[in-house]
A protein has these predicted regions:
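P-loop NTPase Walker
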Residues: 1-102, 108, 227, 649, ...
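Accessory C-terminal helicase-associated subdomains
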Residues: 183-189, 195, 205, 375, ...
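Conserved RecA-like helicase ATPase core segment
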Residues: 34-38, 246-352, 624
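Conserved helicase core region in the C-terminal RecA-like lobe
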Residues: 81-91, 237-240, 265, 565-616, ...
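C-terminal accessory regions
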Residues: 583, 627-682, 923-945
Length: 955
C-alpha cells in the first residue's frame, strides 16, 4: 500500500480519489471498506458502495467478502447497499413501494424493449406537431437521399427521452417556460416525453432512467424517508465517478446529507460515456460542489510496462490544449505516473501497410511471431481493440487471422445470425409457418430493415439442407406433421415456445445439447438466447390471449417485427464474465467494451477514426441550458475532440506488456489525431524495435462468488442436475403457466398484509382493503405476464387470503419481519434466502413459509423438500440474527381446516441439511450436470411432468 492509498483510505468527509489505469483503485476501495468496518466500527449495512457495471459489482462483492471473511467479519450483503445505481434504486423503491407511484409488478425493460415500445406507437409520436424538426426520417449525403429506418428513429426518441429525464427536466416546465425556443424543438421534445411516460405507465414498464427518476422523486417528496436513509447510510463510495450523470449526482447529494461522507473514485481521462448521458462535470466540479473536499491522486501504475505508461502520458499531454479560452482546465493535471515495473525495451510499436489488406497480413504475422518465439503461450493474451468490431475492417482482420489458423473471439461482431445453429433454428421455424415465409417478400414492414429478407432466405436454405440429411429425418417428419396440423386447425397445437422445445429434442439440436452437457457450448448459448427472446415477446403481444396461447397472427408478428428488429438492433453473442478471454482465441472488442479490462498485448487498428459531432448530446445540452440554466461542463465545440482523445487513452492503457498501433498508409486511413504520433513509434520489424525479450503473463479469469438459494438452485439441482444446467447455467427460458401466477398473487397479497401490520396499520387489514390489494396485484401481474386467471380462481385466491386473516384472529403482535432477506458468506459461495414471515417474542422465533399448492403427505419427498427449505432458513436466522429458532411452520393456504404443518427445530437435522447444501454447491461449482432425475418403476417423476426438456430426455 503506497502513501496516496493510505491517505485516501483514512480520509474523512468528501473525498476525490483520482485513480488512473492500473493504479490499484479496487484494492483501495476494498481496504477503505475494511478500515471503516474494523477500525471505525461502522456497520457493513451503513456503507453504500456504487459500481458502474454489474460485473464490477460482482468483482467487488467477491473480493470484499473474501477480505472481510479473513478478518473474521460477517456481513449480510442484503443489508449493505452494494451494486449499480439501478440495483440500489430498485432496492430503495422496493423497500418503500407503498410511497411510490409504481405498480408492484412492473416489468423492467432493457434498451431493446424500451425502443420496441416506442416502435409500436411510432405513428403517435410522428403525429406530434413539428415532430420532424427533431426526429429526421432522411438526410442528404453527397447529393443522395438516405432514409433513416423507423427503428433508428425510435432509438433517437429513446435517447432524448432518457437523456432529458436524467437531467431532471419536467416536460410541463419545458413547455411552459421554453416551449417555443430552439425553433420549437423544446415543445416537441416535451410532448415526446409526455407521450412516452403515458405509454410506459399504461404497460407497467420501467426503464433504467425511470428507476432513477422515481427514486429521486421518492427521496425529494418524503423527507422522513430521506432522513431514515441518511441515518442508515453513513458512508457513501462511488466507483467510476467520471461516468455518472446528473441525476446520479443529485441522488448522491441527497443521500449524503449534511455529513457529506462521500468518497468518489474516478479518472477524468477515461470519461468515454457522454453518449449515455455521463457528465464529466461531476468529477471536474467535485471540489467546487464539496468545498471541504480532500483530493488524492494515485500515481503508481502496477499494470503496464514503463514505456506504455510514458506513451499514454505523452498522448494526453501532446494533444491540443485542455485549457479553455477563460483559463479553465478541462482535465486534472496528473503529474508523472510511475510504473511499478522497471522493464526495459520498446513496448509500443507500429504496424503499417500500403493498404488495409497488407496491414492485416502484417498484424497476423506479428501475432504468429509472438507465439512462435514464446512471448505469448496462448492467443488469448492478445486483444484487438476497435472503434467498432462490426466494421468491415474488423471483420476483414478476423478473416485474415482465420486464414493463419488463429481463432477470434468477437461476441459483439454481429455474427449471431450467421451461426449454423441459429440458421437451423430460425430456418426450421420459418418452414413451420409458410403462411408467413411464403409471403414475407410482399410485406411492407419487411422492407424497413435492410438485409433481413436475405437472412431469412439464407436461414431457410441452410435448414432445408440440414433437413435433407438422413440423420435428421425425425425432425423433418415432425416438421411436416406439425405444419399440417397448424394448416388444418388454423392454430398452434402448443405454445410457440413449447414448439421450439419439441424441435430441440431432435438432432441436430439434441446433438448441441449433448455437447453442452459435456462442457461449455456457445451453440447452446445461442439457442438459449432465442428461447428467451420468444418468452419476452409474450409481454408485447397486442392482445392478451392468456399465457402460452399465441395465435398464428402472433407468430407472424414475431417474425415480421420482433425478430426483425432484434436483428436490426444488433445481437451480441454470449460473453462469459469469468472467462473474458477464452483460451486459443484473439479477443476482438469495442474500445468501450474493453474498459476495465487488461491484456498483455493490445493492438489498436482503427486509427482512421475522426472526432464526430454528437447531435443528440448537443441538443440535450442546449435544452438543459435553456430550461435550467445549467451550462455544459466543457466548450461544446471541443467536446468531440475531448471524447476521441479520452477514448483512445482508454484503449492504449489496457496494455500490460506490448501496445501496437496499426494503420494503412493510404491517404485518409490515419486521421489527424494520430498522424503526429505514428512516425515516432518504431516499426514492429525495425532493428530498433527492442521487444523480443518481453514475455507476457498468462491471462487469468475472474472468479465471482455465486449466490445459492435453496429453492431456486439447491433444490432444483437435487431434483435434476440436468434441469439445473439448462435453466440456471444456460438460462433457457421456462414455459411457466397460470399456476405460477396464482401462487404469486396469493403470496404478494399476504405480503401486503404483513407490511401493513409491521407499519402499525393492522386496523387496515379488513376484507375490502385486502380485496383492493389483491386486485391491484392481479392487474399488474396480468399486465406483466400477459396472462389472466378465471373468475373462479380469483375467488379462490381471495378466499384463501381471507382464510389466513381469519386464522390469525386479529393477533399480529408476534410478527417480526416479512420477506426477510438473509445472506451468509461461505468460502466458495454466498448462501441466501428470503423468509416469508419471521414471528415470535423475545429471542425465540419461528420461521413461517406459505405454500399455495395442495398439502402433500407427511412422508412424501415434497414435504421433505419443504422441511429442508425451512431448515436452511433456520440456519440463516440463528447464524446471522443470533435468534434461537423454536419451530418451523408451513402454512398451506388451500387447507382451510388444518393449514399448518409444524416441525420441531432439530439442530442435528439442520447441521446435516447444511452439509448436504455444501455438497450440492460443490457439485454445482464442479459442473457435475450429467445426471438426470431418476426413473422409478417406469413411473414418470414429478420433476419431469412439466419439464421443458422432457422430450429431449426421451421421457
Amino acid at each position: 500500500m503506497n502513501e496516496s492509498q493510505k491517505a485516501a483510505i483514512h480520509s474523512e468527509g468528501p473525498t476525490l480519489l483520482i485513480a488512473g489505469p492500473g493504479t490499484g483503485k479496487t484494492y483501495t476501495i476494498i481496504q477503505r471498506v475494511l478500515y471503516l468496518i474494523r477500525e471505525k466500527r461502522v456497520k457493513p449495512e451503513e456503507i453504500m458502495l456504487v459500481t458502474y457495471t454489474q460485473k464490477a459489482s460482482k468483482e467487488l462483492t467477491t473480493r470484499l467478502t473474501d477480505v472481510l471473511s479473513k478478518a473474521g467479519i460477517e456481513v449480510n450483503l442484503h443489508e449493505m447497499y452494494i451494486g449499480t445505481f439501478h440495483h440500489i434504486c430498485r432496492k430503495i423503491l422496493k423497500e418503500f413501494q407503498e410511497y411510490t407511484h409504481l405498480p408492484k409488478n412492473y416489468l423492467a425493460v432493457d434498451q431493446f424493449e424500451q425502443q420496441y415500445l416506442v416502435y409500436e406507437h411510432l405513428s403517435e409520436f410522428a403525429a406530434i406537431p413539428d415532430f420532424r424538426r427533431v426526429i429526421q426520417d432522411s438526410y442528404l449525403k453527397q447529393g443522395e437521399l438516405i432514409r433513416i429506418s423507423p427503428w433508428r428513429q425510435c432509438q433517437t426518441i429513446c435517447r432524448y427521452v432518457n437523456g432529458l429525464s436524467e437531467e431532471l427536466l419536467l416536460p410541463e416546465e419545458m413547455r411552459r417556460t421554453c416551449g417555443n425556443q430552439l425553433g420549437g424543438r423544446i415543445e416537441v421534445l416535451a410532448r415526446m416525453m409526455m407521450k412516452y411516460t403515458r405509454l410506459e405507465e399504461e404497460r407497467h414498464f420501467i426503464d433504467f432512467s425511470r428507476l432513477q427518476k422515481e427514486t429521486y422523486a421518492l427521496l425529494s417528496s418524503y423527507p422522513e424517508i430521506l432522513d431514515q436513509l441518511q441515518k442508515r447510510i453513513r458512508y457513501i463510495m462511488i466507483d467510476e465517478y467520471q461516468d455518472t450523470n446528473f441525476i446520479q449526482e443529485q441522488l448522491i447529494r441527497l443521500l449524503g446529507g449534511c455529513s457529506q461522507q462521500i468518497f468518489v473514485v474516478g479518472d477524468d481521462d477515461q470519461s468515454i460515456y457522454r453518449f449515455r448521458g455521463a457528465s464529466i462535470g461531476n468529477i471536474l466540479g467535485f471540489s467546487k460542489t464539496y468545498q471541504t473536499c480532500h483530493t488524492f491522486k494515485l500515481d503508481t501504475n502496477y499494470r503496464s510496462h514503463p514505456g506504455i505508461v510514458r506513451f499514454c502520458m505523452d498522448w494526453m499531454r501532446g494533444l491540443k490544449s485542455w485549457r479553455g479560452a477563460d483559463g479553465r482546465m478541462f482535465r486534472y493535471v496528473k503529474g508523472d505516473i510511475h510504473a511499478a515495473s522497471e522493464e526495459t525495451g520498446t513496448p509500443v510499436l507500429r504496424i503499417t501497410g500500403k493498404d488495409l489488406s497488407e496491414c492485416h497480413a502484417r498484424i497476423a504475422a506479428f501475432i504468429e511471431g509472438l507465439k512462435e518465439r514464446g512471448q505469448i503461450t496462448d492467443y488469448n493474451q492478445v486483444a484487438v481493440l476497435c472503434s467498432s468490431v462490426k466494421s468491415n475492417a474488423s471483420r476483414a482482420l478476423q478473416l485474415q487471422l482465420r486464414r493463419k489458423g488463429i481463432a477470434s473471439y468477437a461476441p459483439r461482431a454481429g455474427w449471431f445470425f450467421k451461426r449454423q445453429e441459429v440458421e437451423w433454428l430460425i430456418g426450421t421455424l420459418l418452414l413451420l409457418f409458410p403462411s408467413f415465409s411464403d409471403s414475407m417478400e410482399n410485406r411492407d414492414d419487411m422492407q424497413e430493415t435492410r438485409g433481413i429478407l436475405d437472412i431469412y432466405f439464407e436461414c431457410m436454405g441452410v435448414a432445408r439442407m440440414m433437413l435433407a440429411k438422413p440423420r435428421h429425418r425425425a425432425l423433418k417428419n415432425w416438421l411436416d406433421r406439425t405444419r399440417s396440423v397448424i394448416s388444418y386447425e388454423k392454430k398452434l397445437p402448443a405454445s410457440f415456445l413449447h414448439l421450439v422445445y419439441q424441435m430441440l429434442s431432435f438432432a441436430p439440436f439434441s446433438d448441441i445439447l449433448d455437447s453442452a452437457v459435456r462442457g461449455e457450448s456457445n451453440a447452446a448459448r445461442n439457442l438459449s438466447a432465442i428461447t428467451r427472446l420468444i418468452a419476452r415477446f409474450g409481454f408485447f403481444l397486442p392482445e392478451n390471449h392468456g399465457h402460452g396461447e399465441e395465435t398464428i397472427a402472433d407468430v407472424q408478428l414475431f417474425f415480421s417485427r420482433y425478430l426483425r428488429l432484434w436483428f436490426e438492433n444488433g445481437v451480441n453473442e454470449y460473453e462469459d464474465e469469468e472467462r473474458y478471454a477464452p483460451s486459443g482465441s484473439v479477443s476482438f472488442l469495442n474500445i468501450h467494451q474493453a474498459k476495465g479490462l487488461e491484456y498483455p498485448v493490445v493492438i489498436v487498428p482503427s486509427l482512421d477514426e475522426r472526432a464526430r459531432w454528437d447531435a443528440e448530446s448537443d441538443l440535450i445540452s442546449q435544452v438543459v441550458e435553456k430550461v435550467s440554466g445549467r451550462k455544459p461542463a466543457e466548450p461544446p465545440k471541443e467536446m468531440k475532440n475531448f471524447d476521441l482523445w479520452r477514448k483512445y487513452y482508454t484503449a492504449f492503457s489496457r496494455a500490460e506488456t506490448l501496445l501496437v498501433l496499426a494503420s494503412s498508409q493510404k491517404k485518409g486511413d490515419t486521421s489527424e489525431a494520430f498522424q503526429w504520433i505514428m512516425p515516432a513509434l518504431p516499426a514492429y520489424n525495425a532493428k530498433e524495435a527492442d521487444y523480443h525479450h518481453l514475455t507476457c503473463r498468462p491471462v487469468g479469469r475472474n472468479v465471482f462468488k455465486p449466490r445459492f438459494a435453496f429453492t431456486s438452485q439447491i433444490a432444483l439441482y437435487e431434483e435434476c442436475p440436468m434441469k439445473y444446467l439448462w435453466h440456471r447455467v444456460y438460462r433457457f427460458a421456462g414455459t411457466q403457466g397460470s399456476h405460477a401466477m396464482y401462487g404469486e398473487l396469493v403470496h404478494e397479497t399476504i405480503e401486503d398484509i404483513h407490511r401493513a401490520v409491521l407499519r402499525g396499520e393492522a386496523d387496515r387489514v379488513m376484507p375490502s382493503v385486502i380485496y383492493g390489494w389483491m386486485m391491484a396485484n392481479y392487474i399488474s401481474l396480468s399486465d406483466k405476464e400477459n396472462s389472466w386467471l378465471p373468475e373462479a380462481k380469483l375467488k379462490q385466491a381471495f378466499s384463501e387470503i381471507r382464510g389466513y386473516v381469519d386464522f390469525r384472529k386479529g393477533n399480529w403482535d408476534d410478527a417480526l419481519a416479512a420477506e426477510c432477506p438473509l445472506e451468509l458468506v461461505k468460502d466458495d459461495y454466498i448462501l441466501n434466502g428470503t423468509i416469508d414471515l419471521l414471528s415470535g417474542n423475545g429471542d425465540q422465533v419461528q420461521v413461517i413459509d406459505f405454500k399455495t399448492g395442495k398439502k402433500p403427505p407427511m412422508d412424501s419427498l415434497l414435504m421433505e423438500k419443504y422441511r429442508s427449505q425451512l431448515e436452511v432458513y433456520a440456519y440463516l436466522v440463528e447464524t446471522k440474527l443470533g435468534r434461537s429458532v423454536e419451530r418451523l411452520v408451513l402454512y398451506f393456504t388451500s387447507d382451510a381446516e388444518d393449514p399448518c404443518v409444524v416441525f420441531p427445530m432439530s439442530k442435528e437435522r439442520v447441521e446435516k441439511r447444511m452439509e448436504e447444501f455444501d455438497e450440492t454447491a460443490r457439485r454445482i461449482l464442479a459442473r457435475d450436470f450429467a445426471r438426470r432425475c431418476e426413473m422409478k418403476k417406469n413411473e414418470l417423476p414429478t420433476a419431469c411432468r412439466f419439464c421443458d426438456f422432457r422430450k429431449y430426455c426421451g421421457r
